[in-house]
Structure formats: structure tokens, C-alpha cells
Swiss-Prot record:
Protein's name in the database: Putative arsenical pump-driving ATPase 2
Protein's job: Anion-transporting ATPase. Catalyzes the extrusion of arsenite.
Domain of life per record: Bacteria
EC number: 7.3.2.7
Reaction equation(s) it catalyzes: arsenite(in) + ATP + H2O = arsenite(out) + ADP + phosphate + H(+)
GO molecular function: ATP binding; ATP hydrolysis activity; ATPase-coupled arsenite transmembrane transporter activity
Gene (name only): arsA2
Length: 299
């Protein structure tokens, strides 16, 4: 099993590219799970289908949009369940206020998405040949990478917490809450396995358009991916204009585009580049995605 991540600036077509890639793999007879961590839930739009939870779109393709709100509720419930096994009621009330504050703090989305994505990838590794992940815009993707990178410290804290649970229960004379301890153990092993998959079985497609802002954001993204040791499979340069447009406006746009195509080529010399022409029509629906997928490589 391999995992392919698609990321980039909002509006460059990463959801279209990731969906078309998943369709292409599934049409080759591979079992594919397409996941979206983007709160915008764009998969429903691109497939022109109302996705309810997990949806099987063909014999080989399953699609799921991770619901951040639902995952946050489950995450909160788990934390309280663990806390109930170790803390007094007065402390629990204080903890409840702290958790509600944390839900609105920066970075909580990255933690919750990491939790949800780790379950999908680790638990279902043997069900699929490929898992394709349509990520949220670049900032969220980098937050996820930082979470993976800091995994060692996080796991160490979990182990310490487990030891404290034992000590608290011994002091109070109560029996250890097995469910809480099992949850800590499961989480530790799952995060470790997810980290291994990210570094050993994952590849990243960076999607951009030949313009200044997407180019600059892609530079930051690719440099961060290299810093974290994640392999960049290719750059997908989307919405490339025809070579010799007749319209004066398009001619001017083409000159700007040529400049950034050259900059992309020079800056990312060691990375494969895939150029996709600007499409005449919106790429919406399974058949359109299948047609669009001819521009993309196989896994």
C-alpha cells in the first residue's frame, strides 16, 4: 500500500488533480481510498455527488470527506473518557473549560485531522492498494507535517501520562481503568505506525499554477517537505494556456505564464514536472475526471 498526498495553494486545482488521480488508479484495477482533509468538502463538488460519510463510487474507488466537527466531538469525548478514569469531579469541571478553550485555539484542527487521518491510513492499510489524500490549503498541510515531525515528543508524553495514571490509581486505592490505558497504548502504536507510513510509503504531489503567488507558496511547501524528509513525487503545473493564443488578453497572460514556467523549471530542477493544459470546460463528474486523468502519471 502507498499513500499519495496532494497539496498546494487554494484554487490551483489540487482537488481536481487528486480526484482524477484516484479515478485513474481505480480504472487500472487498483483498490483506492480517496480522503479529503479539506474543511471545504470539495470532493462532493468535483464528483457532482452528495457524499454522505464514506461513499463507494465504483467497484474500486471509495471516497470519504473527513468531517472536522465530528472528529472534534469524538476527540473531546475520548479525552473526557480518559480523564474520568483518573481525575476527581471538581478537576473534571475545570478540564471541561480548558478543552472548550482549546477547541478554538490555533493548531487544534491539525491535531484532530492528524488523529482522523492516522486511523484511516493505519486501520485500513490492508484494504487498499493506494490511499490518496486531498489536503487542505498549504498552511494546514504544513501544520500536519509538524505534528508528524513532533511525534516522538508527543508519544513520550503519552507514556508519561500512562505512568501517572498508574500512580494516581495506586494512591487512591482504586483499580486501574483498563479502557483508558488501552486507549493510550493503542494511540501510541497507531501514531508510530502512521509515522512510518508517512516516511516510508508516502509521496507528495505539489499542485500549482504558473503564477507568482502559487509559485512562492509551492517553494515554501516543497522546502518544508524536504526538511521533514517526505518525498516529492512531482509538481503538477495546472491551467497552462495554449502556446500561441490569438486573443490579446490571453497573449499578455501567456507572457506572464512563460516567465513563471521558466522560474518553476529553474527552481525545481530536481523534481519531475507535469504540465496540464487549461480545460475548456469545468472538470466535474466521474467521466470528466477520467478524461482529465490522462494528463496524470500512474502511481
Amino acid at each position: 500500500m502507498r499513500v499519495f498526498f496532494f497539496g498546494g495553494k487554494g484554487g490551483v486545482g489540487k482537488t481536481t488533480a487528486s480526484s482524477a488521480f484516484a479515478v485513474k488508479l481505480s480504472e487500472q484495477g487498483k483498490k483506492v481510498l480517496l480522503l479529503s482533509t479539506d474543511p471545504a468538502h470539495s470532493l462532493s463538488d468535483v464528483f457532482n455527488t452528495e457524499l454522505q460519510g464514506e461513499t463507494k463510487l465504483s467497484e474500486n474507488l471509495t471516497v470519504k470527506e473527513i468531517d472536522l466537527n465530528e472528529e472534534l466531538k469524538e476527540y473531546r469525548s475520548r479525552v473526557f473518557k480518559l480523564a474520568e478514569a483518573t481525575l476527581r469531579k471538581e478537576t473534571l469541571r475545570e478540564l471541561e473549560g480548558i478543552i472548550h478553550s482549546l477547541e478554538e485555539s490555533p493548531g487544534i484542527e491539525d491535531v484532530v485531522i492528524f488523529e482522523a487521518l492516522s486511523k484511516e491510513v493505519v486501520y485500513r492499510e490492508n484494504e487498499y492498494d493506494y490511499i490518496v489524500v486531498d489536503t487542505a490549503p498549504t498552511g494546514h498541510t504544513l501544520g500536519l507535517l509538524k505534528t508528524v515531525r513532533n511525534l516522538g515528543n508527543f508519544l513520550e508524553e503519552i507514556v508519561k501520562l500512562k505512568e501517572k495514571v498508574y500512580e494516581l490509581k495506586k494512591l487512591s486505592g482504586k483499580s486501574v481503568h483498563e479502557e483508558a490505558l488501552e486507549y493510550l497504548k493503542e494511540r501510541k502504536e497507531r501514531f508510530k505506525k502512521f509515522s512510518e507510513i508517512i516516511y516510508d510509503k508516502s509521496y507528495f504531489f505539489a499542485v500549482l499554477t504558473p503564477e507568482k503567488l502559487p509559485f512562492e507558496e509551492t517553494k515554501r511547501l516543497v522546502n518544508s517537505l524536504k526538511h521533514y524528509g517526505i518525498r516529492v513525487k512531482a509538481l503538477i503545473i495546472n491551467k497552462v494556456l495554449p502556446e500561441n493564443p490569438q486573443d490579446e488578453f490571453l497573449k499578455a497572460r501567456k507572457e506572464v505564464e512563460k516567465k513563471f514556467l521558466k522560474e518553476i523549471e529553474n527552481y525545481f530542477m530536481d523534481i519531475e514536472k507535469i504540465s496540464i493544459p487549461y480545460q475548456k470546460e469545468e472538470v466535474v463528474g466521474y467521466e470528466k475526471l477520467k478524461e482529465f486523468s490522462k494528463f496524470l502519471p500512474l502511481g
